[in-house]
């Protein structure tokens, strides 16, 4: 937006930030957002820090595109879709917050890359500054920042014995 004031926010939403888990079944953040009672906005951010990352190939980006198309096909009967933004994550959320009131952000906890860990720390700070709750769900049985494995096997058992987190798609407003 250049020289244009953002409109007053008119709708409060729960944002589900889709990162690597591009599915609608067994998706804890989606279930939690739907249970919040607020309309759910599904968001995928194409981040510049990932475009040049050697962990992401053309096939990876093709998979992401196809997965989002598949999700949108599943959501079409409910007149909603994944919103895709190309930007840094904090800037993308800031742009959304100019148009909508973000009640909370729901996502999976991303693991494995230093650049996404640093990005998540920035997001945590941004959410804190904006008084927006960020609810991260564990990815599998990995515990981010674990310095020992004393409780790991108990945690693994609990995670893998838990029932699927499924949401009725018609509850995503």
What are these regions (language model features)?
Residues 2-173:
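Active-site "lid/cap" and pocket-lining segments within catalytic core domains
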């Amino acid at each position: 937006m250049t020289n244009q004031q953002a409109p007053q926010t008119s709708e409060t939403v729960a944002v589900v930030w889709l990162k690597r888990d591009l599915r609608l079944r067994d998706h804890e953040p989606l279930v939690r957002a739907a249970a919040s009672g607020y309309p759910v906005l599904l968001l995928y951010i194409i981040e510049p820090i990932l475009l040049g990352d050697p962990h992401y190939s053309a096939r990876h980006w093709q998979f992401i595109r196809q997965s989002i198309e598949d999700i949108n096909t599943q959501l079409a009967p409910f007149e909603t879709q994944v919103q895709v933004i190309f930007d840094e994550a904090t800037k993308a959320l800031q742009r959304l917050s100019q148009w909508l009131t973000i009640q909370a952000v729901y996502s999976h906890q991303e693991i494995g890359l230093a650049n996404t860990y640093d990005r998540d720390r920035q997001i945590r700070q941004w959410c804190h500054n904006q008084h927006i709750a960020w609810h991260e769900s564990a990815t599998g049985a990995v515990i981010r920042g674990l310095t020992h494995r004393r409780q790991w096997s108990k945690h693994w058992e609990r995670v893998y014995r838990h029932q699927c987190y499924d949401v009725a798609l018609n509850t995503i407003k």
